[in-house]
Amino acid sequence: MSTEALLEQIGKLTLVEAADLVKKMEDKFGISAAAPVAVAAVGAAPAGAGAAEEASTFNVILKGFDSAKKIEVIKLVREITGLGLADAKGLVEAGGKAVKEGVAKAEADDLKKKFEGAGAQIELKAS
């Protein structure tokens, strides 16, 4: 199989299938898909500078859900992401996955309220 054909097949994967592929590749080859963090040898930042620069975009992470409200959470994931039923169910059951990435603080807070109202536990991570 050529690399072009392989790339074409990977492009057809769903979000859940792609995440599973990455996990399996990390395990098999002992690598991490996380981008390496560059360490700068610059002097310390002025005190309070980090607090003043609040993150502007966030990832909405589904950490868990009330099992009695699983269907409600899946419906909300489908509404927010546009995923099909099977993909939304897989994302919800996997846990710890991003439902939406790179959203503004106001939208992230709104999504968090919606998900918590549906019985889900949400974490907002700066992106």
Swiss-Prot record:
GO terms for biological process: translation. GO terms for molecular function: mRNA binding; structural constituent of ribosome. One of its GO terms (cellular component) is cytosolic large ribosomal subunit. Pfam families: Ribosomal_L12, Ribosomal_L12_N. CDD domains: Ribosomal_L7_L12. Keywords: Ribonucleoprotein, Ribosomal protein. PANTHER family: 39S RIBOSOMAL PROTEIN L12 (PTHR45987), LARGE RIBOSOMAL SUBUNIT PROTEIN BL12M (PTHR45987:SF4). Homodimer. Part of the ribosomal stalk of the 50S ribosomal subunit. Forms a multimeric L10(L12)X complex, where L10 forms an elongated spine to which 2 to 4 L12 dimers bind in a sequential fashion. Binds GTP-bound translation factors. Forms part of the ribosomal stalk which helps the ribosome interact with GTP-bound translation factors. Is thus essential for accurate translation. Belongs to the bacterial ribosomal protein bL12 family. This is Large ribosomal subunit protein bL12. The gene is rplL.
